[in-house]
Amino acid sequence: MLWKSVLSVALIVLGIHDCSFKFLEIDKNEEEFAISVEHVVFHFNENQDDDFAYKFLRVRRSLRQKYTLKYLVDLEMGRTLCGKYDEDIDNCPLQEGPGERKVRCTYIVETEAWVTKFTILNSTCVQT
């Protein structure tokens, strides 16, 4: 009988552990997610050797880890004609022709938007 109790507790713990790390689809317009996207684009530009700024094009996936404010941000960005320190990059035209570049990035970001704190836990970008 004791082994059944131990097995039941183990299954409950494993079930809770498994559920707590799943990412679930969310509305890409959710406020904390949208702020996280802005931070990701800023972070990408700050850490690029390229003198040109990249701007947000579209969200491919918007996910949040269950019971947390950790977001998986999967987005596309395009290289603009503006420098990365210019104002109003959102309205800057994209480069065309030989200078045209687009990237797809996936970031995992922990967000505490109420204190303007963002922690990038993981990131991967590939040129498309």
Curated annotation (Swiss-Prot):
Glycosylation sites: 122
Keyword annotations: Disulfide bond, Glycoprotein, Protease inhibitor, Secreted, Signal, Thiol protease inhibitor
Signal sequence bounds: 1-21
One MF annotation (Gene Ontology) recorded for this entry: cysteine-type endopeptidase inhibitor activity
Pfam families: Cystatin
Recorded superkingdom: Eukaryota
Cellular location(s): Secreted
PANTHER family on file: CYSTATIN-12, CYSTATIN-12-RELATED
Function: May play a specialized role in spermatogenesis.
Protein name per the record: Cystatin-12
The organism of origin for this protein: Mus musculus (Mouse)
Taxonomic lineage from the root: Eukaryota, Metazoa, Chordata, Craniata, Vertebrata
Gene: Cst12
